[in-house]
Amino acid sequence: MKNIILVKYLDADTKARRIETALAETRVDFQVNLEKQCVIVEGNSDMVAVARKVINDLGFMII
């Protein structure tokens, strides 16, 4: 199941790369969409929770 996490101020390649690098270290299947300022997570609610925590820990605000 696809889940969309909206990330406030995800408006630069460097920010997207920070998220990609951090999530790559997890088992989360994800895609960062810079144009729509979101992270698309494929998986169950546990995978979404992991992704949300990683994104929050990086200092990003989830909408």
Task: Identify the residue ranges that each predicted region occupies.
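Short glycine/proline-enriched coil/turn segments at helix->beta-strand junctions
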Residues: 24-28, 44
